């Protein structure tokens, strides 16, 4: 069972290597590891579904509708919260900012560990707080008490999580590096209409990103192929490139979002180049 642990001295009785976690997350002062329903509530909380006012900002997060709001492309956003709401940033694709809510002008930062480390960690969320009081307020707002936050986790997943967290800095930097290379490739491809990624020099947000994002620019790249996006993407989905593999999702407006994994940069670029050059016929896509 995994329980929130506010001091990181232990995470319930799982025996996770918390010292290794803290070695990578030096900016984290207090936080919680959530599983099951409490994790879901933390990742999808908003002012309408929680007990108390929350001002939720999503960073590099693509909504199910496919819309991408301006805030979602600005993980370094530091705008003040309105009223007395608890400022919450849900990090999906902004791994360098895990456990650094203060840098983003937030009280709480929530990271989807499934998005960070792959399918083996689906259903787990990591919550970092500016203070113990902010963490307590957030857990109360999402209705997650110490006992309620418990959920069964397979022992193998537990051990793998401890290892992955100890490698967090390397994992996040690698994925960000791959995303930057992919974005640069896509930005200069004649069959790509536009690319949005804060690490690109020509991106409107690049100047602010370089001032505020010293550990990388996230691992999601949004772009618009000139041809049918669904045929391009479904060809890539046929063969995952690795354990934490890059993938492309298609938005309703025909744009695509690349989620980079841990493959070699040349493999990611090669897969994109092949997909753009030889998209599958739309009728062959499920």
Give the positions of each predicted feature.
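Short, hydrophobic/proline-enriched secondary-structure or compact coil segments at domain edges
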Residues: 60, 219-221, 258
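Generic structural motif
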Residues: 102, 131-133, 226-228, 263-265
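Conserved small-domain helix->loop->beta segment predominantly found in fold-type I
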Residues: 163-164, 180-254
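Conserved PLP-enzyme active-site core in the AAT-like
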Residues: 2-190, 196, 202, 271-275, ...
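PLP-dependent enzyme catalytic core of the Aspartate aminotransferase-like
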Residues: 7-10, 67-68, 73-75, 171, ...
């Amino acid at each position: 069972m995994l329980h929130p642990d506010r001091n990181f001295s232990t995470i319930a009785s799982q025996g996770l290597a918390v010292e290794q976690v803290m070695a990578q997350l030096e900016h984290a002062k207090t936080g919680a590891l959530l599983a099951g329903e409490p994790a879901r509530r933390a990742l999808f909380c908003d002012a309408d579904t929680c007990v108390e006012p929350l001002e939720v900002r999503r960073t590099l997060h693509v909504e199910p509708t496919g819309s991408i709001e301006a805030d979602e492309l600005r993980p370094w956003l530091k705008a003040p919260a309105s009223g007395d709401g608890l400022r919450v940033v849900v990090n999906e694709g902004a791994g360098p900012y895990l456990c650094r809510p203060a840098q983003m002008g937030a009280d709480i930062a929530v990271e989807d560990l499934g998005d960070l480390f792959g399918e083996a960690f689906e259903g787990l969320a990591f919550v970092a707080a500016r203070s113990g009081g902010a963490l307590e307020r957030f857990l109360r707002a999402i209705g997650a008490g110490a006992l309620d936050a418990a959920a069964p986790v397979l022992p193998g997943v537990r051990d793998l999580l401890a290892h992955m967290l100890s490698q967090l800095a390397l994992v996040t930097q690698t994925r960000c590096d791959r995303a930057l290379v992919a974005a640069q490739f896509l930005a200069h491809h004649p069959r790509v209409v536009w690319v949005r990624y804060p690490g690109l020099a020509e991106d409107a947000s690049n100047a602010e990103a370089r001032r505020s994002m010293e550990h990388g620019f996230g691992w999601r790249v949004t772009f618009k192929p000139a041809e049918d996006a669904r045929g391009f993407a479904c060809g890539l989905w046929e063969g995952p490139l690795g354990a934490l593999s890059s993938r492309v999702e298609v938005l309703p407006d025909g744009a695509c979002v690349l989620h980079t994994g841990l493959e070699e940069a040349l493999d990611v670029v090669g897969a994109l180049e092949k997909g753009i050059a030889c998209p599958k016929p739309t009728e062959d896509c499920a």
